[in-house]
Amino acid sequence: MAITDIFQLNNNDKWERYCDLLYSDDSLGFWLDISRMDVAINDFEDFNEIYSKAFDALESLENGSIANIDEGRQVGHYWLRNPKVAPSAEISDSITKEIQNISKFGASILNGEITNRHGKKYTDVFWIGIGGSGLGPLLIKESFKRESIGLNLHFLDNVDPEGISHKLNSILPNLDSTLFVVVSKSGGTPEPLIGMEQAMKFVLDHSQNWSSRAIAITSKGSKLDVLANNENWLDIFDLPDWVGGRTSITGAVGLLPAALIGADINKFLNGASQMDALTRVKDIKNNPAALLSLAWFKSGNGKGLRDMVVLPYRDRLEVFSRYLQQLVMESLGKKFDRDENQVNQGIAVYGNKGSTDQHAYVQQLRDGIDNFFVNFIEILHDPLEIVEVKNKRPGDYLSGFLQGTRSALTEGGRQNLTITFKSFDESSLGALIALFERAVSLYAELINVNAYNQPGVEAGKEAATKIIKLQKEIEELLDDGKQRTLNEINDALSSDSTESIYLILRKLSENSDHYSMIGNQSNPDKLIISKT
């Protein structure tokens, strides 16, 4: 049924459709409404066979099958919140032990059992991680950090020199009471490695010890693991090779920051585990992740033809759209399917928060190009300390704006769905994350792509490595002090990209007095390059 047809229904028919398509679970205080999406009741029967295969595939994954074929790895982030479902006692025991270690470490930091060199409590954490190793912890912080409780978190998630300088200098007043966390599965990823080296130099330049306040989250036996052990870092937590960065938030990557800000990590894990249980049901209509993935599939005709706009009506979920960008787009954005057919799949994700966005891009959503669906996220419970003033309750207005925007979009024929939680806490965030993780897994089965590899990301890393190698070759060539044109440099290095050489030298000449580019930049082919 088209969304325009839905809006034309009379009230009784709309209410009947709403009730037929509404999913709810009392134990989680959770509702999912897809009645304003392009989903028909008979879709449950029509999609039964393909979902039966998808459910079996997800069950096989949880049982330990090799899901990441490219790397020959299992995919086990679901085990992190319920070690009992892990495929071996060894894995189960290691997960349980790691949760206990993180809880104990967090408590020891917060209660002052572990202190800095002066016997004072730690006050801050400088977190170095890229992608999911940074976005997950940031989501945890934004969701649960409260003033005067726990440590203050600062994030370094890029190699922007200006950003590195600003963020390191911002912690200088509390440097003596700052912990440093470095997250890297392999220990060789350039961004966290460079961030670690800069942070380490900053600490040592200020005559302080690095290893006594440094913490690693990495795979056992990795370069970072070896370094942390050799230098006797404060602690090391495990990032198993069967956990991908974009699904690492229920492991040490998310649990450690949660523990350090005083959040309840067991409640967080239980919420995710409860949602996992709900989404193991092999019946589309009674499985919220299946309903969500079906709505995505029908909306974009199984080809990602519509973007996903994420609109949480809660400030603490403002970064959730960024978190979902990686989870959804890195998992589903694939050139080839599992049978090597070129499919160019994916769903684009963007968003911010309501009601702020009603004064921004919602104008286009209502009246512009119809190439999206909106995912509203609603929280019912409001904090008691915000009371009615002059006959106005902020929560009533927030809810009114959500309902009004929903209605306006539906009236305009724009598809939308709503996820509602009774309250927002560690449990509901865990459940929300698990819901999307499992919807992504099911959707990937529908379109026959591998949700657990990232060949495009790897291609970008390889290309960046080639550029760094080319820069070193350019620097070595110019060490003789001779003047050369860009074409002469290109020929000398047998390069296939004069443009790359130009871009490298333009950057070098701006940041070093040793390199000069003589001539008119509007005619780069005439420039004379030299090094003094």
Swiss-Prot record:
Top-level class of the enzyme under EC nomenclature: isomerase
Cited Pfam families: PGI
Molecular functions (GO terms): carbohydrate derivative binding; glucose-6-phosphate isomerase activity; monosaccharide binding
Catalytic activity reported: alpha-D-glucose 6-phosphate = beta-D-fructose 6-phosphate
GO CC annotation terms, alphabetical: cytosol
Pathways per UniProt: Carbohydrate biosynthesis; gluconeogenesis; Carbohydrate degradation; glycolysis; D-glyceraldehyde 3-phosphate and glycerone phosphate from D-glucose: step 2/4
Primary site of residence: cytoplasm
Disulphide bridges: none
Active site per database record: E330, H359, K461
EC number(s) on file: 5.3.1.9
UniProt keyword terms in alphabetical order: Cytoplasm, Gluconeogenesis, Glycolysis, Isomerase
Cross-referenced InterPro entries: G6P_Isomerase, Phosphoglucose_isomerase_CS, SIS_dom_sf, SIS_PGI_1, SIS_PGI_2
Compartments in which it is found: Cytoplasm
Biological process according to GO: gluconeogenesis; glucose 6-phosphate metabolic process; glycolytic process
Protein purpose: Catalyzes the reversible isomerization of glucose-6-phosphate to fructose-6-phosphate.
Similarity field: Belongs to the GPI family.
Name of the protein this chain belongs to: Glucose-6-phosphate isomerase
